[in-house]
Amino acid sequence: MKNYKRMTVGEIVADNFNNAGIFDKYGIDFCCHGSALLPEASKTAGADMEKVIEEIEHLAPTTSENIDFKSWPLDLLVDYILKIHHRNIRTQGPEIEELLDKICRVHGEKHPSLYNVQALFHDSLSDLNAHLDKEELVLFPYIYEMVKAKLENTPLPEFHCGSIEAPISVMMAEHDIEGERYRHIEHLTNGYTAPEDACNSYRLVLQQLKAFEEALHQHIHLENNIVFPHSIK
């Protein structure tokens, strides 16, 4: 049996992504603060660590739906992030933003916190697009070169950023900003709960925002806890 008390929360989720649901339940941040050991993360979240461990140990066995990303080749995992997560942000983000703008026009006067959510999400998309560009144009191409050099047993080309740790530290800092931003959105929306007078579109945009945040959590988890550590090794 694993000693979860000596594992980071990022490692625990990397072992089985279904554990993410348990951490979400207790407010434990596994993506932006995945390097924290479980005792520390539990204390920060005000969670009973023993109860958390009990739920992890009683979780249903891994199924085919729980992909073992940490066993994937690094370049394949980067491909997955690009084709699934980056594409989702670029396509779903503007659609959610458009619907959110509509909801603000109709319901903003009665529910003024919507304007704060609108501003936060707008800033998020703007910053995320710049963030994705940096990964796609700078960091990920070099990771592909690293994998290629290792497979072909050839010298690694010089990186114009110096060391790969430099852009990775920038990406992780930007992940922290997004994590805090979506914690604020979740608070403003009462955990993405629609008010009683909400129309169907209002309820829909909250569902979409929640799904967007959950996908972003997995995106950040894959990079912070798997791709980046493996790239630095």
Protein language model regions, located:
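Small-residue-biased structural context
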Residues: 1-233
